[in-house]
UniProtKB/Swiss-Prot annotation:
Coiled coil: none annotated. InterPro entries: AAA+_ATPase, P-loop_NTPase, RuvB-like, RuvB-like_C, RuvBL1/2_DNA/RNA_bd_dom, TIP49_P-loop. This is RuvB-like helicase 1. ATP binds at G73, G74, P75, S76, T77, G78, K79, T80. DNA helicase which participates in several chromatin remodeling complexes, including the SWR1 and the INO80 complexes. The SWR1 complex mediates the ATP-dependent exchange of histone H2A for the H2A variant HZT1 leading to transcriptional regulation of selected genes by chromatin remodeling. The INO80 complex remodels chromatin by shifting nucleosomes and is involved in DNA repair. Also involved in pre-rRNA processing. The lineage of its organism: Eukaryota, Fungi, Dikarya, Ascomycota, Saccharomycotina.
Length: 457
């Protein structure tokens, strides 16, 4: 007997990568804006989450643009998680541009230019366009000729009569001779389903009407059903772009399709700066669209982590950029206390931010987690990583988290899971965590070893 067996499909969901903040789903607030103790992947930090909830409401109401927020707190207190939760609460339609302070330093592009680029990335433009479309099956296609106005025996096409049929009726259109050229290019014949944009005169052949599907043809045709509704339709198309997209489109016009221009594009890998004049022109066009009601400005969020890495020049530029007419909400994060502002010798300021900018910021403080909160976070994270942890091991990890750091115990979960798997255990035990702890040092133990072997290393 011939052996036949089915190959089981492996689902791709089992191989999704688990990142540091995969478990964050939102701020975890109720309908009154009050933070629940454990919700949306967050544990604790009630005051900070409620403050971010107010900020989200202000952004949605478009009353927050041009203002800046500082998330201040120690390492592993959830500053990046809060910024990520803000972006998830706002949804995919609101631009969210994350970057680290050190990203702004480049050999090719000025620091201020790199900052302005990210500013423009965080501002969206929603363009609404109403398109009038004629769609249907071609029942008649008659070009009408007229005498050539230049004389001679030749004839010119004055207009084209096209009959279109849809499920709800038929229409006969008189089209411009320029549209006839598009019809010829698309090789349209009677029985084809086409649509014509009335604004641009663009013609698109969708396919052959399925009424002709029984015809024998040597060429393989794509048969489509008769369009539903009326022949004349109005469609509203919404496009979401950022101001940076518009800047780039105008700064680098596409070359031709010939070999020379394509080679030219390959030979120019250097990043070109977008001039202030070009941005001003783009802003003018955007303002005109907004006045006409065609477009709507969507101020997004620019998140700058490790803000203490920025220098005094960038901070000075940031002051001016925040006061401009078109500015996003800027969220800064810092885990430093009183330090010298980069680029200065004697200006010591909180969080590494100059005093004049600190005065403009709304500061949200994140607090260290207590033992119970660390325990809840570990159990949540273990569930995300599909790991089972014994109660004793969970208690041990929570105690270890208070002695070392939250990040260290979260990073111990995966190695402990592998050790438990090798020992054929379904759940992670205290012995597995102890073994992983011996294999991987935390920062305090590593520092202690370095101090003891000071003369050796």
């Amino acid at each position: 007997m011939v052996q036949i067996s089915e190959v089981q499909e492996q689902s791709s969901t089992a191989y999704t990568r688990t990142a540091a903040h995969t478990h964050i789903k939102g701020l975890g607030l109720d309908e009154f804006g009050v933070a629940k103790q454990v919700e949306g992947g967050f544990v604790g930090q009630a005051e900070a989450r409620e403050a971010c909830g107010v900020i989200v409401d202000l952004i949605k109401a478009k009353k927050m643009s041009g203002k800046a927020i500082l998330l201040a707190g120690g390492p592993s207190t959830g500053k990046t998680a809060l910024a990520l939760a803000i972006s998830q609460e706002l949804g995919p339609k609101v631009p969210f541009c994350p970057l680290v302070g050190s990203e702004l330093y480049s050999v090719e592009v000025k620091k201020t230019e790199a900052l302005m680029e990210n500013f423009r990335r965080a501002i969206g433009l929603r363009i609404k366009e109403t398109k009038e479309v004629y769609e249907g099956e071609v029942t008649e296609l008659t070009p009408e000729e007229a005498e050539n106005p230049l004389g001679g025996y030749g004839k010119t096409i004055s207009h084209v009569i096209v009959g279109l049929k849809s499920a709800k009726g038929t229409k006969t259109l008189r089209l411009d001779p320029t549209i006839y050229e598009s019809i010829q290019r698309e090789k349209v014949s009677v029985g084809d389903v086409i649509y014509i944009e009335s604004n641009t005169g663009a013609v698109k052949r969708v396919g052959r009407s399925d009424a002709f599907a029984t015809e024998f043809d040597l060429e393989a045709e794509e048969y489509v059903p008769l369009p539903k509704g009326e022949v004349h339709k109005k469609k509203e198309i919404v496009q979401d772009v950022t101001l940076h997209d518009l800047d780039v489109a105008n700064a680098r016009p596409q070359g031709g399709q010939d070999v020379i221009s394509m080679m030219g594009q390959l030979m120019k890998p250097k990043k070109t700066e977008i001039t202030e004049k070009l941005r001003h022109e783009v802003n003018k066009v955007v303002a005109k669209y907004i006045d006409q009601g065609v477009a709507e400005l969507v101020p997004g969020v620019l998140f700058i982590d490790e803000v203490n890495m920025l220098d005094i020049e960038i901070f000075t530029y940031l002051n001016r950029a925040l006061e401009s007419d078109i500015a996003p909400v800027v969220v800064l994060a810092s885990n430093r206390g009183m330090i010298t502002v980069r680029g200065t010798d004697d200006v010591v300021s909180p969080h590494g931010v100059p005093p004049d900018l600190i005065d403009r910021l709304l500061i949200v403080r994140t607090l260290p987690y207590n033992r119970e909160e660390i325990k809840t976070i570990i159990s949540k994270r273990a569930a995300v990583e599909n790991l089972q942890v014994e109660d004793e091991a969970l208690e041990f990890l929570a105690t270890l988290g208070t002695e070392t750091s939250l990040r260290y115990v979260l990073q111990l979960l995966s190695p402990s899971g592998i050790i438990a798997k090798i020992a054929n255990r379904a759940e992670i035990s205290v012995a597995d965590v102890e073994e992983a702890k011996l294999l991987f040092l935390d920062a305090k133990r590593s520092t202690k070893i370095l101090e003891q072997s000071e003369n050796y290393l």
